[in-house]
Design a protein with these regions (language model features):
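A fold-wide structural signal in alpha/beta-hydrolase
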Residues: 40, 66-75, 202
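N-terminal cap/lid segment of alpha/beta-hydrolase-fold proteins
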Residues: 1-39, 95-101, 159-162
Length: 406
């Protein structure tokens, strides 16, 4: 029988920002209780997704393979409207609204600094949207004019965007919890125990989910056997740091976390994750270069340290035409891994001829590869491969400028 079990446990506090966590870590485990389980498959959701999106794939895997499937609602996963986030405004949003209206000569009998809630903000913006439409009809503004404003995204569970570290630790903690509290029968349990680690663990993710899979392998390499990754970022370069949420401090139009274009005809909202990270160098929450590089799987010195531990296998896909992540970054990452003795299978999609309409559907970010087919193509072979020896010191440290992360 297929079992779907939801867990809620304590996980990590935010050690970087010295913030006590108030929320529980939630995850779901799906397995067939009639089978002896050979591996844990962890499907990691990307931005805009959560475990509710994974149930069909989880049950497919549990029915067709001898695996238990883990899906984790990691820290700040509810940071998009479709996963429960709500809009809010802060002082900077009010200032942007005020100065933007002044720039096009719109004066309202409202003190913008008195706007306390998003609902109040929405009413003003709705009025401005209609006023802009009137100005367009009167030829005072061009038809293609669009006003850009900013708003914040308040995640569920009163969380905030730490980005990467707490999310990866949550995934690792969920894996460790299941290994300690196995609810299913394990195939070759004596071999698993002898090899110094838990049951074979496979991380699968697309985009941000793939990024977190690689980050888990960096933080806790002895707990990960295979990373199966489609189109992830391996640095925060190419403006990818904007997903942290402090981009409104620099250029709110260029560096938003996500654009909201469906609410108003004449206004686009640049939305930003709620975060304590800031560009203010005087703040204890300053996002320094050290904070950046610890979050980047692509760091040669860090990879050298990781190579001293049990080595996960990497299987990855990436398009030459990916609009977010440069293929060259990924090539560099996997070339370094190979040099350091990691097993890597890196599939580069570089030509329209590779589009088959079923597995590879386009040349854009993610290549349209269905998660089910990605799993179907690789999982059986992964399960046939021997469990690696994980006997090692279960602690790793990475020097990041003036900081050391352990």
């Amino acid at each position: 029988m297929i079992i779907n079990q939801i867990y809620s446990i304590d996980s990590c506090d935010d050690v970087e920002l010295n913030i006590k966590r108030g929320s529980k870590l939630e995850f779901r485990l799906t397995y067939d209780d009639s089978k002896e389980i050979e591996a844990i498959v962890c499907i990691i959701s990307g931005l805009g997704g959560d475990i509710d999106d994974n149930l069909y794939i989880e049950e497919y895997c549990a029915r067709n393979y001898n695996v238990a499937v883990l899906s984790v609602n990691y820290h700040c996963i509810g940071n998009r409207p479709q996963t429960g986030a709500s809009f809010y405004i802060n002082e900077l949003d009010r200032l942007i609204l005020k100065t933007s209206l002044e720039a096009i000569g719109i004066q309202l009998p409202v003190d913008m600094q008195n706007l306390k809630t998003y609902d109040e903000f929405y009413c003003v913006v709705d009025f401005v949207n209609k006023f802009i439409e009137k100005l367009k009809k009167e030829k005072e503004l061009s038809e293609d004019y669009c006003l850009y404003l900013s708003v914040g995204l308040e995640p569920t569970k009163n969380e905030y965007q730490n980005y990467g570290i707490m999310q990866a630790i949550d995934i690792i903690n969920a894996i460790l919890y299941i290994n300690i509290n196995l609810p299913f029968k394990v195939s070759n349990m004596s071999t698993v125990s002898r090899m110094g680690g838990g049951i074979k663990t496979i991380l699968i993710g697309v985009s941000h989910g793939g990024y977190l899979a690689n980050l888990c392998a960096k933080i806790s390499p002895w707990n990960i056997d295979v990373v199966l990754d489609n189109s992830s970022n391996v640095t925060l370069d190419n403006d990818l740091w904007r997903f942290i949420g402090f981009g409104r401090e620099i250029d709110y139009v260029k560096y938003c976390s996500v654009g909201i274009t469906y609410m108003f005809k004449n206004i686009k909202l640049a939305a930003f994750d709620k975060t304590y990270w800031t560009t203010n160098k005087q703040s204890p929450y300053y996002f320094s270069n050290a904070r950046k590089i610890v979050r980047e799987p692509l760091n040669k010195e860090h990879l050298k340290i990781q190579s001293l531990y049990p080595k996960p296998k990497y299987i990855a896909y990436h398009s030459k035409f990916d609009q977010y992540v440069l293929l060259e970054k990924r090539e560099n990452y996997f070339n370094i891994l190979r040099e350091l003795g990691f097993e890597v299978d890196f599939i580069k999609i570089t030509d329209e001829k590779e589009i088959d309409g079923k597995f590879i559907k386009n040349l854009e970010h993610g290549c349209g590869i269905p998660m089910k087919l990605l799993i179907k193509k690789h999982l059986l072979q992964i399960l046939k491969e021997p469990l690696q020896d994980k006997i090692c010191k279960k602690e790793v440290s990475y020097k990041c400028d003036e900081l050391v992360y352990t």
